[in-house]
Amino acid sequence: MRCFHFGTARYADPMGRNEVDSRYFDEMRRTDAAPRAPYAGYSDWLQVEDLKGLMQRAREAETFFRRTGITFNVYGQSEADERLIPFDIVPRIIAAKEWARLTKGIEQRVRAINAFLHDIYHRQEILRAGRVPVDLIARNEAFLPLMMGVEPPGGIYTHIVGIDLVRTGENEFFVLEDNARTPSGVSYMLENRATMLQLFPELFTKNRVRPVSNYPTLLHKSLGCLLYTSPSPRDS
């Protein structure tokens, strides 16, 4: 059975059996090698595409990212290592119903994070109830005593949150971590989508893919709601 590579990813020949380690969930195919429902159309497209042509377009994407400086740094070593953003021509497809369920769960999680922070900087009921050890908060470098009693606009402390998710099975997701202090990576997502649109426009004409280009507008609107507003001179 043939296998091919796009960047650092490895895929089984779409015409053959699946070679994904059984310990991991295969996003694209079921255990019988048939495509999962969200990937049915993409799988049909992939099987008729020319392998050399696909690899060439993958190289074009990497060349574009390198030329335009779309990279990220890996810190923690003696020197920062600049790398290209991961680009995969086999997309991770999430169906609309699945996305709606994830959205509700993520929104609930972010509300819980903000409620926790509001309690920590106000009544501290979660500490008095013994649910969270006091020392865990008091000795945490991220805890700011000067914020005690401060009420941010809308009671929102975490304005932008990056939730790292991993799928472990059909309709089963887990949160790896909540990036709530300095989340990053949105620009990579925007550039990735723009590159996919340029290299594979036919995929977007055949499938109803939700746009991501409106993210900057939504971000601006969200941040605008958090501004402190001072009374107008006419109101005084």
Task: Mark where each language-model region is.
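Extended active-site and interfacial segments that coordinate phosphate-rich ligands
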Residues: 174-207
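Conserved small/polar residues in nucleotide/adenosyl-binding loops
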Residues: 228-235
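Conserved metal-phosphate-binding beta-hairpin within the catalytic cores
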Residues: 147-182
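Low-complexity, highly charged intrinsically disordered N-terminal segments
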Residues: 57-143
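Short N-terminal or domain-adjacent regulatory/targeting segments
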Residues: 195-227
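Short acidic, Pro/Gly- and aromatic-enriched capping/linker segments at domain boundaries
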Residues: 14-30
